[in-house]
Amino acid sequence: MEGPPPSKRPCGLPPGVRLVVPAAAAASASNAATAAAAAAPAGAGAGASKPARPSAAARPAKGTPAASAATTATGADASAPPPDPGAPTWDAFAAEFDVAPSWRALLEPEIAKPYARLLLAEYRGRCLTEEVLPAREDVFAWTRLTAPEDVKVVIIGQDPYHGPGQAHGLAFSVRRGVPIPPSLANIFAAVRATYPTLPAPAHGCLEAWARRGVLLLNTTLTVRRGVPGSHAPLGWARLVRAVVQRLCETRPKLVFMLWGAHAQKACAPDPRRHKVLTFSHPSPLARTPFRTCPHFGEANAYLVQTGRAPVDWSVD
């Protein structure tokens, strides 16, 4: 907002002292004004025409105080870049990725940030030049299968499977009809070690777990086909971390299963508010065999202890 108009008193004169203009100077100024009026073309009365635009040489240099004052007076600098169009609306984002409305409160504040706009722009650019997995409508499939208020267990993965037809938006899960990957086979073995009466899964689709309150979330949501880790530089991890943090703040007493160093570094829930379980990664290359992981029984024990129903770890 503009401040009060500057004082009419010439700079450097104390209050009460008037500037006296010599009579000769005043007369000279009056004669000059009369001559200028006489030289004006006929019909150029007050308000008849706009004052001429000063030449480029007469205009103040850009960046000087005079230029700043001129910009303020006119309201804008004609050479300034156009304003930032801003973040995408929630409706546009949700429509593009088929995001469930239940996650709006956790996702909307994040997608409005500059880094998220750059992330989404880079993702769209990659889609034009390479085969990106999973399909666009499955990148946020986890939001459609598990509402925030239903989350009991959070399992953190790294990035999607990079083989054709495998990834569909849930960590460690593959579509029906796709061979069960070795890591998922080890997960199933650990489940059956704790619950031996469960039938052996005939497929690797974990949508049933997701519908029962198990959030299966990768830290990187996309990948280039055949190139594991290729989309980690896009910045998905920052978005996922922020969403998990908001989930931790709004949902107490969650169970976190953090398998391997990557998951344990990417996600750091408060152990005073949540049950945090750590183990080696289920990959067959891990030093500690994952088949001995007791997390599935420990998670259910904690859920029962805190007054909630245990998770059914069977796969439909």
Curated annotation (Swiss-Prot):
Region listing for Disordered, in residue ranges: 36-91
Entry EC no(s): 3.2.2.27
This protein's UniProt keywords: DNA damage, DNA repair, Host nucleus, Hydrolase
Gene3D superfamilies reported for this sequence: Uracil-DNA glycosylase-like domain
GO molecular function annotation: uracil DNA N-glycosylase activity
Biological process per Gene Ontology, one example term: base-excision repair, AP site formation via deaminated base removal
Catalytic activity: Hydrolyzes single-stranded DNA or mismatched double-stranded DNA and polynucleotides, releasing free uracil
Active site residues according to the UniProt entry: D159 (proton acceptor)
CC annotations in GO: host cell nucleus
Regions of compositional bias (Low complexity) in chain numbering: 36-79
Domain of life of the organism encoding this protein: Viruses
UniProt xrefs under InterPro entries: UDG_fam1, Ura-DNA_Glyclase_AS, Uracil-DNA_glycosylase-like, Uracil-DNA_glycosylase-like_sf
Location within or outside the cell: Host nucleus
Family named by the database record: Belongs to the uracil-DNA glycosylase (UDG) superfamily. UNG family.
Primary role: Excises uracil residues from the DNA which can arise as a result of misincorporation of dUMP residues by DNA polymerase or deamination of cytosines. Therefore may reduce deleterious uracil incorporation into the viral genome, particularly in terminally differentiated cells which lack DNA repair enzymes.
Annotated protein name in UniProt: Uracil-DNA glycosylase
Organism the protein comes from: Suid herpesvirus 1 (strain Kaplan) (SuHV-1)
